[in-house]
Amino acid sequence: MRNISPLRYRWSFPVKFFFYLLTLATLLAPIPFIFFKPGVPDKVTGSLIQVNDFKTYPVNGDLYITSILVTNPDSPVFGAETIVNWAIGANVVLPRDAVYPPVKPAQVIQRDSRSEMETSKITSTAAALRYLGYDFIELYFISDIRDYSNAKEKFKVGDFIKEIDGKVIGEIEEIRSSYAEKDIGDPLLIAVDRENAKGELERITDEIILVENQEVVNEDGSKRPAIGILVGATARFPIDIDFNIRGVGGPSAGLIFAVGIIEKLTEEDLLRGRKVAGTGTITPSGQVGAIGGIEEKMIGASRIGATVFIAPRENCPDIKNIPAGLKVIPVSTLAEAIVALRAPDSFKPRSCPNS
């Protein structure tokens, strides 16, 4: 029986050089991925929330909004850094389309993020003041109209949305729910108030047709109807409140903004010397909504020494790895968050099933 040695191929220099170039090109080529990692939390109980010409109370403790650092939508990500980040776990690596709408231009994404933050300041103030029993007037206006929307032919940026299909709009979520059960191609009657040349408001009512949402699809991949309008919020509040924050976008600071306002406007000591962090969107009525990057935000909170983390209950399926020493309190409303903060340290809140 003979031993047969395997054949050994010797690649010529041109072939080797070609594969070297191919490998190098792959590592240096931009690819459609993004990184995100925990951001540094911002302290709300310092000068971030400023109450003007109204009595405030000393704050005993620290309250933080949390954030994530995400690759900008127009920033290139290269193959080599993607492989390294994935291998060592320095950052979470995700396909770009998992975070940013694939058809939305980078400048629109960034503008929308800033608009969401501005709206969050209004809705959090509304939620906090409503919780404290103050009355005020809320207004919702068109802040942008998408090119794919036929509303562009009938309405203008700055129009105040007053009615949809004959129903008076009292809260921003009523705008979204007004067409949630409708289909693409269905009509929608919208009434707005528009300021004329004399500075007077005129009521304008017109019909639009629901179009396919070109930025978001349903979880099952089916197409979602849209009016193609971005809505901003403003209000005439009895208390003047400013937010001194830059470089943070999106709506996820709303819940903690609202808690911070309540902490400053009331004598009650909710923080009791603790470091409390959290996240969550909020509606003017105090409903708390889910956000992205919850685990990265918990890590950021843990790094600055927070012992309590307030999170949206809707995010419970995403809360799996809780940092040591961090008590996570899931809530559905602002009122639940306040009740949880009032409770003694020995109190064990109803936790997420999988945490």
Locations of the language-model features?
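N-terminal Lys/Arg-rich, disordered targeting/topogenic segments
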Residues: 1-12
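Hydrophobic membrane-insertion alpha-helices, especially the h-region
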Residues: 15-33
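Conserved PDZ fold ligand-binding element
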Residues: 151-175, 298, 305-307
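PDZ-domain C-terminal substructure recognizer with occasional recognition of PDZ-binding tails
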Residues: 177-223, 320-355
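Glycine- and Gly-Pro-enriched alpha-helical subdomains that act as flexible
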Residues: 264, 276, 284-309
